[in-house]
Each structure stands twice: as structure tokens, then as C-alpha cells.
Regions:
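Phosphate/NTP-binding elements of NTP-utilizing enzymes
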Residues: 1-333
Length: 333
């Protein structure tokens, strides 16, 4: 039928874009960049999913006045297996290519572990390595990939803020943002942005088990943007999740959390759906796995009430400023 199921946050995003972005007359889409990115990705990597083609134009949205980016930050969260890393692989390779055309536009992908940071890097490396046409435009080494025409470098980094200094990146991609307890590492890398034209940051991940961390703060920002409460915050929030835990019982609802399940299914999506279906069926004999399944596959953390003293929203409600204690007496026993 051509129809897709959307969760509330994506419906809100479409309404927000129609009301507050697409109605503006001081911005423009760079159609050449959009078409070049899609053509580059589909020639050397894979057909882009509809959700990737939906986001892509907003990556190349500019102000008419000075050709600066309208969106410099993107928050992309969906159920595990949806293709987030593939998307950032294509973007990273395109950004260092002559088609993008910005000299010294370095790209770093940052994650908590080296293995995760290397996921997209390896995909780009393997795509270039042994391909004579791509090897003519890129030097692929084990630690970095260089776009010859623009002298732009793509590399992976781990998120140990104590050992990092902000570089001169054009783009930083923060993977597995659900594991970040605070924004310390973001502050390190974002400090190097802006020295090169068109600075971009991508926050990628699926929900996790760290509460009140950086991921939750991104969700709070997204809510304020989509509600119209903070229209000055130009972050693009693309959030895919179930609206209600009960929806997990209806497999047709799963595409709310993972757009890879939109019809028609690609061969890769069919394999993924079969895997997720088996995991869901296994919960009948292993109910303790439900919390992880809901968090990672449905992108909707579900609290196990048997393990929790107080619900998280009740804990947050107790937050209050500490009183001034200086020069007050301290009594101990």
C-alpha cells in the first residue's frame, strides 16, 4: 500500500519540519550534494533505505545568506540491526570524497570500545581495498583512510576523554551514545569543530541501561524541539521506538522501532526479522531476557519492577537543589 507505521516522535518530526523548517524562505537544499551522496552510496555500498533517504536532504540544508548549514547536529536512534552503522559508513566515505569537495574535511567515528569504533571504518576500508576505481580516489590504511582529492582523513577513536584533544574535524560521529554517562567526550571533540566549513556531529545509538546519561539528555532536547518549546535548538532528532510496551505483542508494530521492517522487506531485513522473531519467541522460556529485548530491539526500555525500589520518573521528581551548607554546623555520631 506504500504506507508505513510511524511512532509518535517521527510524526512529531514531520509536523515540526512542515511547520517550522520547510515553510522558511531563507534556506535551501543543495540538490547536487543530495543526489551525489545517494548515487555514491548506492553505487559503492547498497541501496539506501527510505529512512536514510529521508534524513539525507537535511544533511545538505543551508542558509541562503551565507551557505552555512541549517543542521549541524543529528540524533539518530532506532532498534538494533536497523542499519545505523551502514548509514554512517556511506556518509563518512562521501564526506572525504571529491564529490563533497571540502578540503581537509576530516571525519572521526567515536565509540567506547575500539571494536565498535572500527565497525564503520572497516566497512569503508573493505569497500575501497581491492577496488581499482576507489583506490584511485582514496588511500585506505589500517588506521586511517585518506581522500586524495581533498586531503580529508577518516579515522576511528575511542572515547577516553583523558587522552584526547580536539582536532580539526569537519565531522564527528558518536556511536553507541547510550553508553556515555556524560558529555565529556563530546566536549573534547566538538572543541575542534568549526575550523573547517560545514561542521557536523552525529549522535548514533539504540537506547541502553545508563539512565540520566547523555542519551537521556538527547531525548530531552528532542522533546523540547519537537514540541516547539525550543525552536532555537537546531538538532535533527530521528527517533524510532515503540509507543507502548504492549505493541511488542503485534509484530506489525515492530517497524515503529526499526524502519528496516517497513514493507517491502529487503533480503537483509528478512534475515533480521527472522532473528528478532526468534528472540521474541525465546522470551516465553526466558522471561528475564525481556528487559534487554525491549531496550535493544524495540528501543523502549522497560523497567523490571521486581528489581526496582522506585520508578525512574519518581526518582527524577525528587531532584532539588542542595541548600547552602557553608558555615553550618556538622553533627556526627
Amino acid at each position: 500500500s506504500g504506507k508505513i507505521l510511524l511512532n509518535k516522535e517521527r510524526i512529531d518530526l514531520i509536523n515540526y519540519l512542515q511547520e517550522h523548517v520547510l515553510s522558511r524562505d531563507d534556506i535551501y537544499f543543495d540538490e547536487t550534494q543530495i543526489e551525489n551522496y545517494i548515487a555514491f552510496s548506492e553505487k559503492w555500498y547498497f541501496p539506501l533505505d527510505n529512512w536514510e533517504k529521508f534524513i539525507a536532504p537535511f544533511i545538505f540544508l543551508y542558509f541562503k545568506e551565507d551557505d552555512e548549514l541549517f543542521y549541524e547536529e543529528f540524533f539518530i536512534t532506532l532498534g538494533r540491526g536497523g542499519g545505523k552503522n551502514g548509514f554512517i559508513s556511506t556518509l563518512s566515505n562521501y564526506f572525504i570524497s571529491p564529490l563533497h569537495g571540502i578540503n581537509n574535511y576530516d571525519v572521526s567515528v567515536v565509540a567506547n570500545s575500539e571494536d565498535q569504533a572500527k565497525v564503520s571504518f572497516k566497512e569503508v576500508f573493505n569497500t575501497i581495498d581491492g577496488n581499482p576505481k576507489l583506490e584511485g580516489s582514496f588511500d585506505a590504511w589500517k588506521a586511517q583512510i585518506v581522500g586524495k582529492g581533498t586531503n580529508s582523513v577518516f579515522k576511528f577513536q575511542t572515547s577516553n576523554a583523558k587522552t584526547k584533544d580536539g582536532g580539526r574535524e569537519g565531522c564527528v560521529i558518536y556511536d553507541e551514545t547510550h553508553e556515555y554517562e556524560d558529555r565529556q567526550i563530546i566536549d573534547v571533540f566538538s572543541g575542534g569543530l568549526g575550523k573547517v566549513a560545514n561542521p557536523r556531529e552525529f549522535f548514533i545509538g539504540t537506547n541502553g541501561f545508563v539512565r540520566a546519561g547523555f542519551y537521556d539528555k538527547l531525548e530531552e532536547r528532542s522533546k523540547a524541539i519537537l514540541s516547539g518549546e525550543n525552536l532555537n535548538d537546531r538538532m535533527f532528532p530521528f527517533i524510532c521506538k515503540l509507543d507502548d510496551p504492549e505493541e511488542v505483542k503485534n509484530e506489525a508494530m515492530w517497524e515503529k522501532a526499526n524502519p528496516a521492517f517497513e514493507k517491502p522487506l529487503s533480503p537483509r531485513s528478512k534475515r533480521l526479522l527472522n532473528k528478532v522473531r526468534k528472540q521474541y519467541e525465546a522470551l516465553k522460556n526466558n522471561p528475564s531476557g525481556r528487559e534487554a529485548f525491549m531496550t535493544k530491539r524495540m528501543n523502549l526500555p522497560e523497567v523490571d519492577l521486581e528489581k526496582v525500589v522506585a520508578p525512574w520518573k519518581d526518582i527524577l521528581a525528587t531532584n532539588r537543589e542542595m541548600p547552602e551548607l557553608q558555615n553550618r554546623a556538622c553533627i556526627g555520631a
